[in-house]
Amino acid sequence: MAKYQGEVQSLKLDDDSVIEGVSDQVLVAVVVSFALIATLVYALFRNVHQNIHPENQELVRVLREQLQTEQDAPAATRQQFYTDMYCPICLHQASFPVETNCGHLFCGACIIAYWRYGSWLGAISCPICRQTVTLLLTVFGEDDQSQDVLRLHQDINDYNRRFSGQPRSIMERIMDLPTLLRHAFREMFSVGGLFWMFRIRIILCLMGAFFYLISPLDFVPEALFGILGFLDDFFVIFLLLIYISIMYREVITQRLTR
């Protein structure tokens, strides 16, 4: 009798599911997993094609003509980085490249000229994706101490000092996540990069995420909710990554006030 009741109950559960034979928990887990994978793929490959946004093409065209007339050094003597990457503003190979918080790369002088030339009331919008640029990250080394490089550093610090502390929405923080995490971990494992207190905080965050994954105590236990119970693990790790990106942005802001 008990066996018959159990079979009837399982049939009722199958009838209540959206797809017959597949539980709703599995469907939710599959949908969320595909959404996370799609978001990750978009974040990784959205910067492959660096085409100027149609709304910025006229401004970039005028700026490009001005830069060509003011260019003192020939293209052959420009210091080049990322030989397979071209600056979409000047159409030359990246010279003293600077990366925006949205992950697009430009010549340092080009993005600064784009800021100075345009009539911006606040932070500029990215010439490619139109996302608000609140942070400029240098990709070139600190070896060159020429006057032009020192002036470029000063302009970049000036821009970051003005706009890096602007409030960010949760969606904007998610869009900035790949770029900020890449720079944060690169500095973490480089000599003279991040100070030790910040490195310790990153390590503690990663250890906390690891122990939460292996801990049997969960907000949504796998024993009760099955595969759906793994979603809270991904959510906690995702929040920790956002927290690391926020800390890294604060570190950059603190450097500017020294």
From Swiss-Prot:
Segments on the Cytoplasmic side according to the record's topology features: 46-201, 245-258
Transmembrane segments: 25-45, 202-222, 224-244
Topology class, membrane: Multi-pass membrane protein
Its EC number(s): 2.3.2.27
GO CC, one annotated term: endoplasmic reticulum membrane
Keyword Transmembrane helix: yes
Lumenal side stretches: 1-24, 223
PROSITE patterns reported for this sequence: ZF_RING_1 (PS00518), ZF_RING_2 (PS50089)
Subcellular location per the Swiss-Prot or TrEMBL entry: Endoplasmic reticulum membrane
Matches recorded under SMART domains: RING
Entries under Pfam families matching the protein: DUF1232, zf-RING_UBOX
GO function terms (MF aspect): ubiquitin protein ligase activity; zinc ion binding
UniProt xrefs under InterPro entries: DUF1232 (IPR010652), RNF170 (IPR038896), Znf-RING_euk (IPR027370), Znf_RING (IPR001841), Znf_RING/FYVE/PHD (IPR013083), Znf_RING_CS (IPR017907)
Any GO BP: response to activity
Tissues expressing this chain: Expressed in the spinal cord.
Primary role: E3 ubiquitin-protein ligase that plays an essential role in stimulus-induced inositol 1,4,5-trisphosphate receptor type 1 (ITPR1) ubiquitination and degradation via the endoplasmic reticulum-associated degradation (ERAD) pathway. Also involved in ITPR1 turnover in resting cells. Selectively inhibits the TLR3-triggered innate immune response by promoting the 'Lys-48'-linked polyubiquitination and degradation of TLR3.
Subunit structure: (Microbial infection) Interacts with human cytomegalovirus protein NEC2/UL50; this interaction promotes of UBA7 ubiquitination and subsequent proteasomal degradation. Constitutively associated with the ERLIN1/ERLIN 2 complex. Interacts with activated ITPR1.
Protein name in the entry: E3 ubiquitin-protein ligase RNF170
Gene: RNF170
